[in-house]
Amino acid sequence: MFEIKARDAMGRLGLIKINGKKIETPTIMPVVHPNPKKQTVSIDLINKLSDVIITNSYITYTTPELREIAENKGIHHLTGFKNVVVTDSGSFQLSVYGNVNVEPMEIIDFQEKIGVDVGTILDIPTAPDVSREKAEKELLETFKRAEDSIQRRNDRNYKLALNGTVQGSTHLDLRRKSAEVMGKMDFEIYPIGAVVPLMEDYRYREVSEIIINSKMHLPTNKPVHLFGCGHPMLFALSVALGCDLFDSAAYALYAKNGRYLTENGTLHLDELKDLKNFPCSCKVCSEYTPKQLQNMKEKERERLLAEHNLYVTFEEIDRIKNAIKDGNLWELVEERCRSHPKLLNGLRVISKYMDFIEKYDPVSKKSGFFYTGYESMARPEIYRHKQRLNRLKFDKIYVTSISEKINTPYSENLNNIPCDVDVLIKDSVFGLVPLNIDTMYPLSQNEIPDLYDFEKNYNNDFISEFLENNAEKVLDISTYNYYISHYNSKKECEKINPDLLRISRMLEYQYGAKIIDNDFEKLSVRRSKTSGRIRNVLLDKEVVFTVRASDNFLIPAKLGAEMLHKKLEFPKYRVIVDKSVEEFARAGKSVYSKFVINCDKELRPFEEVLVVNENDDLLAYGTNLLNSQELMEFDYGVAVNIRGGLKLE
């Protein structure tokens, strides 16, 4: 079972439940050697830090003394780990040595027998850059083994949860095919395999593309595990692309070679020996100086280095979780990707997949948009804004540039005369910003530094294309001035209600349709006494919409929900639920994923939605936590947080 608790980018703060045990994601599974004598870091420390470990069932199977303990007392006793134990099946050994002394079904049986929580099929880990023919042949064998493993588990009623590994080498179409085929099988977790050689060679562009092309075809309701990823510098980007789990022995292997992990890269202990203190405040680094560690006996030094590496690894995981909660994961990704030029390649390549990534990125966030570099121009918030400009049905447009010294929101810092012409400001980051929506997220909830000329020119093509597509609506300055002078007269000015013009455009931008045309004259607004900004939209003194202060989104009250239901064609902005939960929805209780039977296919996370039954009767209204695909695929967790229900009279 997997559910999403919080999200940002494609990253998910989630909860996996397996055999009555819980794993909070994203997280890393420390590799634990099945032989306790060969384990560098004490299992007591790992029990404190981690919800889950990964160990090797193949080594356990082929080592008689380990196998005996595991078969008699179980893998948890052998490793000393209390929570979720995941095992590899020998695929790693297969990739290194070319063969293993176990049959695919043998290792499935063995993983079940020793009480593994999550086992792994014996897939074929196809190396990067092999011929397409070889990659396809090995992929077909992996498919066969996957089907046989699922069948084996079902036929024998095994409790074992299974990893179904996505392969395909560096052939992206094969990765997509693998994800699609494996995704149709009943696996609990989907690892993306055979990427370690790419990471070792700093081929992060290809790693990013493999992750994205796999994610495109994997079910959204299952966790994704990036096999072999253990360096903290890569976690933020991988999480932002939708990876939930990582594993690695890097913490121990690096320590063996005297290497000291940081969230930005790797240092050798020799590079630190002249420092008074370590650049870290973990338990190890607080207790010892670099010189003290350097002068220790090899085994003790290795153990302490491994402990530091483990601490810094989990510290980065915690930092990512916090970034997801705060809605600033993209900023952390951009910071981390500047730690190495090749990692920056891994970030830059994702811009070509932004139409896919945008579907998973929340429409509003706790944190504002922080511009940290040229790559910020390609973020989903900007991509979505440019797409949603097409929702605004302009009649007359005036496009203009303004001084860079004028702060956002522009409408509050310009002397703009109300009229029926939509004024669009050329903006270096967002392309075009209509004054009537410029308070909405992220158009004024942002921090942007002074830009270089090449950054200022980034949106030139977008602006030119927009002007070309709307040529018949665009006014020149003379015509615009005519409208201004016309509406500047007292008689005409009284015909224009700038507040309701703004609200109308904001609703159109947010919901993609004209909402208040017929009710225009009956509506009024209430302003904040402190800021002077619109806070409520009223109909006969009753609240219809509240303008949320953090993002200026229009949040419907009961009247607003009824208005949206009337104006929006079915199934726009609707989540359709099973009749068994109609009463609960009307009572204002949260809607759970398993009761969703259909929805608007364009929904994004954190949109305001209408909850209806199959007859399109309005039951409730609230905020959806999932996008449209997730709403249809998830079986656990909350789908819509209800704001209010419509009780039957």
From Swiss-Prot:
Cofactor remark: Binds 1 zinc ion per subunit.
GO annotation, biological process: tRNA wobble guanine modification
EC number(s) per entry: 2.4.2.48
Assigned protein family: Belongs to the archaeosine tRNA-ribosyltransferase family.
Residues annotated as signal peptide: none
Superkingdom per UniProt: Archaea
Function (record text): Exchanges the guanine residue with 7-cyano-7-deazaguanine (preQ0) at position 15 in the dihydrouridine loop (D-loop) of archaeal tRNAs.
Organism: Methanococcus vannielii (strain ATCC 35089 / DSM 1224 / JCM 13029 / OCM 148 / SB)
Residues binding Zn(2+), per UniProt: C280, C282, C285
Reaction(s) catalysed by this chain's protein: guanosine(15) in tRNA + 7-cyano-7-deazaguanine = 7-cyano-7-carbaguanosine(15) in tRNA + guanine
Keywords on record: Glycosyltransferase, Metal-binding, Transferase, tRNA processing, Zinc
Protein name per the record: tRNA-guanine(15) transglycosylase
GO CC annotation, single: cytoplasm
